[in-house]
């Protein structure tokens, strides 16, 4: 790191798997920005101290991954509307002793669906599978795309209803029907199905029936790599178009980069390079 390079990082536990340093290094090269971005493994009980240490080093911003997104939102000085709605933050901006929290996950998901996959969300029927932090982080930006309907399903129905209730005002403003449905019988023929659960990681079956799919539906798993494969295989086996969350990863990083540097990096070539690197075993 040169003296002129601004310091950024991603904090999480675990963190060794993170592709964020590579992504942001490519963004910096493509936009002519001078920065250094690194991984930081944070003890489960040491997140607040890690933020203090990073700020003392002159850190300018950091991405936050599991399990610290809720704590990041709580510890920030100011919070974006997206963070206030989701209750979680994945991007922190350090400025003059203050910490501003934002959440770019939903923006990344929307960009990858509408631009990467070329599927518009306006006027569509969307099924959001899961009601945890991942789902909460994306529901607001999904609603802002003016879909006709978003149905939320979850193993614990009360959590799905709570997520719906917390976003009811925004849904009404967007004139979108937002409701919680039975996970085992959510209805049929959704245009877009988004898996925001860790069902594949847990070794369980896909948590919704195949009746939610129709030929031409987009089935999107917010995970990527082996974790997403069971869901993707299930979707293609029932005639849907399947897409993993690697594009979401790159797009949310691009949004964070824009917040930090004031420059929007090109995401498409970086995603193409990243897919090639992963396919080659890098």
From Swiss-Prot:
Residue ranges the record marks as coiled coil: none
Keyword NADP: yes
Pathway: Metabolic intermediate biosynthesis; chorismate biosynthesis; chorismate from D-erythrose 4-phosphate and phosphoenolpyruvate: step 4/7
EC number: 1.1.1.25
SUPFAM superfamilies tied to this protein: Aminoacid dehydrogenase-like, N-terminal domain, NAD(P)-binding Rossmann-fold domains
GO cellular component annotations of the record: cytosol
UniProt keywords, alphabetically: Amino-acid biosynthesis, Aromatic amino acid biosynthesis, NADP, Oxidoreductase
Binding-site positions, shikimate: 18-20, 65, 90, 105, 224
The keyword NADP is assigned to this record: yes
Catalytic activity: shikimate + NADP(+) = 3-dehydroshikimate + NADPH + H(+)
Any one GO molecular-function label of the UniProt entry: shikimate 3-dehydrogenase (NADP+) activity
Similarity comment: family membership: Belongs to the shikimate dehydrogenase family.
Quaternary assembly: Homodimer.
Its biological purpose: Involved in the biosynthesis of the chorismate, which leads to the biosynthesis of aromatic amino acids. Catalyzes the reversible NADPH linked reduction of 3-dehydroshikimate (DHSA) to yield shikimate (SA).
Protein name as annotated: Shikimate dehydrogenase (NADP(+))
């Amino acid at each position: 790191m040169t003296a002129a390079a601004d310091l950024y990082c991603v904090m999480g536990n675990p963190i060794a798997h993170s592709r964020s340093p590579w992504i942001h290094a490519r963004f910096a090269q493509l936009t002519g920005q001078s920065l250094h971005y690194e991984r930081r493994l944070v003890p489960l009980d040491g997140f607040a101290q890690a933020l203090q240490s990073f700020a003392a080093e002159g850190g300018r911003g950091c991405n936050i991954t599991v399990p610290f997104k809720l704590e990041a939102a709580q510890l920030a000085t100011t919070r974006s509307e997206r963070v206030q709605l989701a209750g979680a933050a994945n991007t922190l901006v350090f400025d003059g002793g203050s910490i501003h929290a934002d959440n770019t996950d939903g923006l990344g998901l929307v960009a990858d669906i509408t631009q990467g996959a070329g599927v518009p969300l306006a006027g569509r029927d969307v099924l959001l599978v899961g009601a945890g932090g991942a789902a909460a982080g994306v529901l607001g930006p999904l609603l802002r795309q003016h879909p006709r309907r978003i149905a939320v399903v979850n193993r614990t129905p009360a959590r799905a209803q709570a997520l719906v209730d917390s976003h009811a005002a925004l849904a009404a403003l967007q004139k979108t029907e937002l409701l919680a449905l039975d996970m085992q019988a959510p209805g049929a023929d959704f245009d877009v199905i988004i898996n925001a659960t860790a069902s594949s990681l847990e070794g369980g079956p896909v948590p919704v029936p195949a009746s939610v799919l129709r030929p031409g539906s987009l089935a999107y798993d917010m995970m990527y790599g082996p974790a997403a494969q069971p869901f993707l295989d299930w979707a293609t086996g029932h005639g849907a178009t399947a897409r993993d969350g690697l594009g979401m990863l790159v797009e949310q990083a691009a949004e964070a980069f824009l917040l930090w540097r004031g420059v929007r990096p090109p995401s498409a070539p970086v995603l193409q390079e990243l897919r090639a690197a992963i396919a080659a075993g890098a």
